Amino acid sequence: MNELLVEFLGGFTKTNQWSAILPEIMLGVLALALLGAEMALPKNKQTLIPRLAIWGQVIVLLVVIGCIVWCNVGESEYFSGLIIQNDITQIMRAFFLVSSILVCYLGQIYLSKQSLPKTEFYALVLIIAAAMMLLVQSANFVMLFVALETVTVAFYVLVAYSRTSQFSLESGLKYLILGALSSGILLFGIVLLYGIAGNPELMGSSRDSLNYNELAKFITLNTNNLVGVDNMIVKIGTLLVVAGICFKIGAVPFQIWVPDVYQGAPTPVTAVSYTHLTLPTTWL
């Protein structure tokens, strides 16, 4: 058992790419630990769960801060260009952890006055924080879509978390429908851009046609070569990607759903929705 543990921890070295996302892995493990603690602890010890969630995130935050202070990250690519880390992304990771800690604290106060499941709330907040930390590091449309959809699916549950409230259930249903619509629009735009940029004769077989930088270079260098249908596909694909992201963050003119969803969602959920989705996605 000890040998397996040493071998596992030994994998998180500076040369191993998994060490780059160690804070996100720690949040995922912590979320699973909370669910396991709920089953293992007696009812009179359930109050330890929110403390475990908060202090666990504090430990992860210290790891991120230590990386900011002592590690010279520079501009580093991991997982074949799926994510890029630099000083700004490290600061954004710390921002998500701080806001997630505050949301868990607000959630503890809110849930103490409600007869609602508590552990699942903290686990979902941790998953959202981990996904958003990956989102701001994404350099590829695959990572962008997977991380963004992980956040969105978790929000589907959190918006309708107050299941005894008609307004909360209504908000959850509206968010589910509009979220699915925005995901479809975003994915369709990504497919169109990949379809035109994935041509090896234009892009080159060694380049990643879903990478932001490579795609931008392709469009810039081939502006004069893309005529007729190809040029129209690029424009439509770009428009759909922008529209899908604007739907997600509630930007004008796609903000109609925001008042209804925020009105019915629990207060901590509204806080986590704005801090974890709107502001960082706008920055991205």
For every predicted segment, state its role.
Residues M1-L277:
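Alpha-helical transmembrane segments of multi-pass membrane proteins predominantly involved
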Residues H276-L284:
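Single conserved hydrophobic/aromatic residue that forms the stacking wall/gate
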